[in-house]
């Protein structure tokens, strides 16, 4: 009897100690916020959304903004670049330098993909919050706009790409998704942006507006691969007519004014990245350090 009592007491003591240790090991961190805690407060989500602009802007710094256009009829390198940079030359000439080891190709992906993931987290968080519905609505529009932009550019290069949706992680995983799925997300992101974004901001010209969202939605309808069944020029036309009818935008009288570093955010601009002409806070264009706006 005593032996069994001793065994029972020992087992009970072990169970209590194990439970106590378990409780101790599961103490919430006090020096940092968990993602769940971040998602609870809209004040914690807004910096994540605003950081998306910085991430997207980083994709365009220096020569980065030119790389996706090399090999098209929009840009062409000079002989110096062709001689001095094999990786860069391959982007323009489609020669042996355009291969899986190209740092230029990998940088196009690596500069954008982390921001896609961050945007997906912000979208998930804003879908959960019940605080300040109007503010959350605008931030949702901004996060969707940036994710749509990034996925648009990545799919133009790689076609089938992964889709990050925090509500469908088990279903979608991390692998490439069919083109139709990819472009449904791109188009739906821009539709959300058109429904949620304001026409302007008081003193923050770098933020996405409803005009920019309509422009990108129109571009997405035109650019969607035919096999997706989503290409629709009639819908694109309606998007662009909506912009015209807003009465906020018009063409400049002098085309050259678009490229003046001291003339940012003109009445022709729908969405601009705020660069200046001083290295390293600049964007290269034809080997000049000038202000480049990237109107959609």
Write out the residue ranges for each language-model feature.
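Short linear capping/connector segments at secondary-structure termini
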Residues: 31-34, 97-100, 165-172
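Hydrophobic core
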Residues: 13-16
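Conserved, well-structured interaction surfaces
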Residues: 46-60, 84-158, 173-184, 190-205
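Short coil/linker segments at helix-helix boundaries
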Residues: 159-180, 229-234
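Short coil/turn linking the two alpha-helices of tandem helical-hairpin repeats
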Residues: 155-156, 162, 201, 223-230
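Bacterial N-terminal signal peptides that target proteins for export
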Residues: 1-8
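C-terminal motif of bacterial Sec signal peptides marking the signal peptidase cleavage site
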Residues: 18-20
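An aromatic- and glycine-enriched ligand-binding surface/loop that stacks and positions planar moieties
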Residues: 22-87, 191-192, 207-293
């Amino acid at each position: 009897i005593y032996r069994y009592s001793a065994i029972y007491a020992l087992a009970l003591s072990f169970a209590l100690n194990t439970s106590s240790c378990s409780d101790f090991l599961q103490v919430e961190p006090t020096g940092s916020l968990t993602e769940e805690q971040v998602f609870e407060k809209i004040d914690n989500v807004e910096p994540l959304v605003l950081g998306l602009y910085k991430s997207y802007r980083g994709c365009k710094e220096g020569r980065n903004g030119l790389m996706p256009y090399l090999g098209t009829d929009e840009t062409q390198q000079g002989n110096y670049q062709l001689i001095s940079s094999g990786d860069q030359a391959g982007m323009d000439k489609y020669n042996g330098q355009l291969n899986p080891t190209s740092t230029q190709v990998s940088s196009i992906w690596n500069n954008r993909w982390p921001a896609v993931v961050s945007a997906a987290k912000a979208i998930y968080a804003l879908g959960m919050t019940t605080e300040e519905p109007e503010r959350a609505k605008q931030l949702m529009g901004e996060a969707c706009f940036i994710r749509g932009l990034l996925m648009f550019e990545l799919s133009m290069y790689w076609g089938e790409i992964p889709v990050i949706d925090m509500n469908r992680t088990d279903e979608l995983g991390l692998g490439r998704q069919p083109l139709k799925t990819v472009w449904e997300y791109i188009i739906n992101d821009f539709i959300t942006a058109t429904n949620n974004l304001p026409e302007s901001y008081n003193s923050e010209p770098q933020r996405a507006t409803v005009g920019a969202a309509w422009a990108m939605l129109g571009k997405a309808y035109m650019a969607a691969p035919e096999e997706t069944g989503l290409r629709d020029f009639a819908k694109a036309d309606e998007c662009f007519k909506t912009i015209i009818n807003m009465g906020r935008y018009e063409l400049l009288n002098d085309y050259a004014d678009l490229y003046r570093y001291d003339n940012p955010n003109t009445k022709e601009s729908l969405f601009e990245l705020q660069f200046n002409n001083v290295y390293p806070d600049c964007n290269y264009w034809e080997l000049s350090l000038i202000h480049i706006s990237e109107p959609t």
